[in-house]
Each structure stands twice: as C-alpha cells, then as structure tokens.
C-alpha cells in the first residue's frame, strides 16, 4: 500500500491475501501547525455539544489551544483529570460518565495513551464519535480499534472504534517528555518481534497472515530506524516519522482485524510489568516499550 498517511483515510479494497482491508478514519493530519485545522476538520459539528477530555499536563500543552479554537462555533464542555499518573480503570471511566453532558455530539480527546484509550471506549459505549488530538508520540494506539483498560487490577483489551479524526501537531509532539519520545520509538522497534510472532502463529497455528500489511509495517520500521538518531535532539522530521509510523501501526491492526501486525510477546511482558507496579502500590507511570529503549 504505497500511500501517504493522509491518503490512508477511507481506504477500502480487496487484498491479494483474500481479505477486504478498510480504514474507517475520515481525517489524519500530521505536521507543523495542524492543530489549527481542527475547527475545519469537525465543521459538521458546528453549533453542537463537544466534550473535551484531558489532564492537567495535556491541557497546558494543547487543551487551551483546542478550547480557544472551538469556543466561538461550538458548545464546549470539558473535564480535566488532575491525577499525576492517570490509569485507564473503572474509577476513571466512571468519572467521565458523571461529567459528560447528556446530549454530547462529539468527544475530543487531548492526550496520548490513557486519554485516547478511555475516550475511545467511552465513545464506543455511548455511540458518540471521537477525535484525538495527540500530544506525544509515545504509543501506537492513536488509530487502533481496541482499548486496553485496567479492570479489577488486570489489563484487559476491550472493543472500541476508529477515531473520526487524528490530529498530531508536530510542534506539540516534539516537545513531549523525552521518555515518551523514546517509548514511541521503542514501540515501533517492538514490531520486529511482533511480526516474528505473527509468522510463528501462521506456521504453528495456521493463523491468517497478510504479506502486504507486513510490508507496510516494515516500511515504517525502516524509516524510523534511519531517523532514530534525531530523537534526542527532538528533530521535527524524526518525530513526524515516528508519529506516522505509530499511526500506521494502529491502522494495520484495523486492516487485518487483529493485533498481530503490531503486538506480540513484548506486549504481554509490558502489560505484566504495568500490572505488577500498579498492584504493588507503585503509581509510577509505566510506558509501554521502555524495555525497548533501554539501550538508546
């Protein structure tokens, strides 16, 4: 699939693997200053109720700007989580159910991993479309169709929906904490083991496999490898390459209807570490793929 990230939206075709691949995202914008396009991207919701989900960190780096852009043409309400380390658990989702206006027409998530996951799940359960305004290139869930949540202290993956739009302003993304930049690169490098596991599953379990999707994921891996040295200097083109690779990784999951192209044994380890820390009372925010960046 030789398409740019923005051209992947609305993709729908029969692949040589025998499966119909589709991408149910209307708009993807990645680049400098693209946050300013938000009112145009959601213009069909002008005059309607928009609910913004953010935390104290993401409010400062992007949430204020989102409100400023939307306050004239949209009915805006919001909820700002003030937890230092927000977890995607029952308490967090329950709070959103208390705060979201009854007649909300659109959810706008401002953040990255946790904010995106809880917003996707909330939108799916309530039948409300959502848009994600990314703030860090830290994980591959922006374009995913599932939400990993913590239920009864255990990491469980629930069905979700594609976002209506993904907006990742590189001017914002490149200023994320360095650990989050490294985690995003680590998440991409982890696709090598994920793809290897997919091959093993094909051979041993006779699982479905798509060479074209594998090729798509590998092409993004190569771009990120070549640009990896620019992470420490927050090079804009490097951050854009990582961001686009993370989004494409999520798209690959949706295209095949399974997490195989992007998630293998390394994700099981990551989930175990996260649950161990949380259940031991350690509130330290665990970033998936930190194990992949330990040598950077």
Where are these regions (language model features)?
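A glycine/threonine-rich phosphate-anchoring loop and its flanking beta-alpha core
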Residues: 125-223
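Short beta-strand/turn micro-motifs composed of small residues
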Residues: 53-54, 111, 168
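Short helix/loop capping segments that flank catalytic or ligand/cofactor-binding pockets
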Residues: 38, 61, 141, 175-176, ...
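Active-site histidine-anchored catalytic micro-motif
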Residues: 110, 139-143, 148, 273, ...
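ATP/NTP phosphate-donor binding region
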Residues: 1-106
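Solvent-exposed alpha-helices and their adjacent loops that cap or buttress functional pockets
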Residues: 20-22, 45, 99-102, 123, ...
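Active-site segments that bind and position negatively charged phosphate/pyrophosphate groups
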Residues: 214-294
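A short, small-residue-rich loop immediately preceding and capping a beta-strand
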Residues: 100-122, 126-136
């Amino acid at each position: 699939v030789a398409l740019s990230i923005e051209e992947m939206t609305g993709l729908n075709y029969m692949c040589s693997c025998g499966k119909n691949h589709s991408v149910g995202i209307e708009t993807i914008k990645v680049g400098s200053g693209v946050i300013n396009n938000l009112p145009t991207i959601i213009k069909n919701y002008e005059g309607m109720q928009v609910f913004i989900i953010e935390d104290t960190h993401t409010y400062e780096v992007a949430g204020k700007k989102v409100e400023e852009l939307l306050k004239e043409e949209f009915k805006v309400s919001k909820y700002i989580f003030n937890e230092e380390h927000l977890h995607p658990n029952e308490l967090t989702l329950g709070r959103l159910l208390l705060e979201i206006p009854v007649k909300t027409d659109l959810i706008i998530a401002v953040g990255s991993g946790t904010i995106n996951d809880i917003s996707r799940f909330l939108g799916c359960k309530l039948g409300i479309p959502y848009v994600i305004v990314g703030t860090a290139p830290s994980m591959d869930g922006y374009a995913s169709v599932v939400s990993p949540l913590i239920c009864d202290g255990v990491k469980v993956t629930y069905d979700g929906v594609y976002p209506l739009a993904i907006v990742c302003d590189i001017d914002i993304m490149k200023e994320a904490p360095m650990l989050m930049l490294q985690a995003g690169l680590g998440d991409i490098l982890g696709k090598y083991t994920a793809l290897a596991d997919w091959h093993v599953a094909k051979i041993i379990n006779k699982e479905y496999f798509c060479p074209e999707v594998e090729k798509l994921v590998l092409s993004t891996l190569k771009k990120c490898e070549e640009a990896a040295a620019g992470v420490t200097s927050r090079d804009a083109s490097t951050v854009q390459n990582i961001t686009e690779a993370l989004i494409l990784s999520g798209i690959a999951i949706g295209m095949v209807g399974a997490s195989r192209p992007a998630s293998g044994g390394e994700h099981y380890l990551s989930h175990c570490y996260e649950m161990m820390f949380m259940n031991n009372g350690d509130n330290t925010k665990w970033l998936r793929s930190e194990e992949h960046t330990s040598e950077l």
